[in-house]
Amino acid sequence: DAGIVAVNTVDVETYVRYVLPSEMPSTFDAEALKAQAVCARTFVYSQMKNTQYALYGANIDNTTAFQVYNASEAKQSTDEAVKATAGQVVSCGGSLITCYYFSTSAGKTEDMEVWSSSTPDFIHKVESVDDNSPYYRWTSELDLSAYNDPQYGTATGISVDKTSDAGYVLSLTINYGNKSQVFTAENDIRKALGHYQKKVTLNDGSVRENMSMIPSAC
C-alpha cells in the first residue's frame, strides 16, 4: 500500500551470471556449473510472461520463489560456465521446459506431483542419495498456539495427509476445531510451516534461525 519498490533491469546473461554463484557453490565441477547455468537461463526465459509483478514492470523477484539473485562479486568458474553455455536453454517439443532444480534430495528426485501438476514425459524419478548434505534431514519444534488464526480460530492440530514415495509432504492440514486449512502446493506447505518457525537443526547438527520457510517439504 505504501513504500518504494526497487526494480533491477538486467539482460538475461548478466542475470544468469549472478544467479549461478547464488544457487550453486562456485567450487563445483565445471560441467555441473554449466548444467546449472542452462537451467537458470531456461527458467528465467520461461518466466518472461509471468504477471505476478506486472504492476512493477518486473517478471520475477530475487528469492527462492524464483531464483536467488545476489548481485555480489561473480566468480571466475561460474563466469566461464555462463560464457560456455551462452544462449543455451532446454526445450521439449519446441517449448521451453519448466526447469526446476534443488540443492538436496530426500533420496530420489520427484515428479511434478509435488506442485500438484501433471508430469511431462521428459521427467523421470531417479535414485539420488544425498545423505551427506546438511539439509538431507532436519528437525524443528513448533508451538501450535502460534497458528491460532482470527478467521479460523484456535489451532488444534497439524496433520500430514499425503506423502510422496521420497517422503515429501503433498498435503498438509492445519485443524481449527470445525474448520481447517489444507495446503497442497510445495511452497505453500513450506511457508505454512516456516512462518512461525524460529529454529531448524540440520542433519550435521548445525542450526539455522529465522528462515522465511522450511528447507524442504520432506
Task: Locate the predicted segments by residue.
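Conserved, single-site charged/polar hotspot
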Residues: 1-218
